[in-house]
Amino acid sequence: MGMRFTHTSTRLLASTALAVLLTAALTGCQTTQKQETTGSLPASSAANSEADWRREVDTWAALYRSHPEDPVNAMQYAQALRATGQRSQAVAVLEQASIQNSTNKALLGAYGRALADVGNYSQALDVLSRAHTPEQPDWRILSAQGAVLDQLGRYEEARGYYASALKIIPDEPTILSNLGLSYALSKDLVKAETTLKRATAQPGVGPRARQNLALVVGLQGRFAEAEKIARADLPPEEAAANVVYLRQMLSQQQKLDDKKLAPGKPAAPPARSATSPAARS
């Protein structure tokens, strides 16, 4: 399946390229997957094609209609809906299921992520806080909470959650990837690169962390190195598409920088990203 990219609604950011970093990792944070990334050049879904996901929608829709109170039916149906871009419907499904299963922590985790997916960050934080307890913290939920705080521009708070998650599972690449992007969003590209390199050095790391690293390296002007990183771990067709996208983002960044430096012209307003069909945490 070709790589696709999403832009979720974000706080004001200084550039289009950094706005892309807030592509919700949360958009791919399913309860059955290890994907809780703040944002990125989203990785492709190796498991399911778009046609596969549409079949999943039909399958789980039937099961959900027959037993809407079953949390597994609701979560699987919502996952398929999110994968096919039907995010608002996924929220509605999980909201109804959470009313009937108010103490099901896995369901609350899925609901919180889905809320973040549609930009309801404050409500997402509230729901995610009920998806685990201080006595039994879940590193995936901690990472998701950090990702939501990053969406709100509360970077220091977000890093506290990532630190707590890393105490539970040290050097987990999805947490490190989020942490690296948190630094990037606050314009500390050196720390971002260091952290993302640490993420990509871990065993079993997925392609997403490498694509995040590629964007951060490119934002520092090392374009050839960024393209080399962007091509890694991908089939030729997807690698080429990823490089094209990387070049587009970096080109937009350069145009904004040139506009800000042009004499006699007001600085360009901060970019907002808009929601579009998604790939990915």
Model regions and ranges:
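N-terminal leader/linker segments that initiate helical-solenoid repeat arrays
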Residues: 2-4, 11-12, 22-76, 80-84, ...
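Terminal, low-structured helical/coil segments at or just beyond the last alpha-helical repeat
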Residues: 33-36, 203, 207-209, 213-281
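Structural marker of alpha-solenoid helical repeat scaffolds
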Residues: 66, 100-101, 131-135, 168, ...
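Helix-start (N-cap) detector for alpha-helical repeat units in TPR-like alpha-solenoids
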Residues: 71-72, 105-106, 138-140, 155, ...
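Canonical tetratricopeptide repeat
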Residues: 76, 110, 143-144, 178, ...
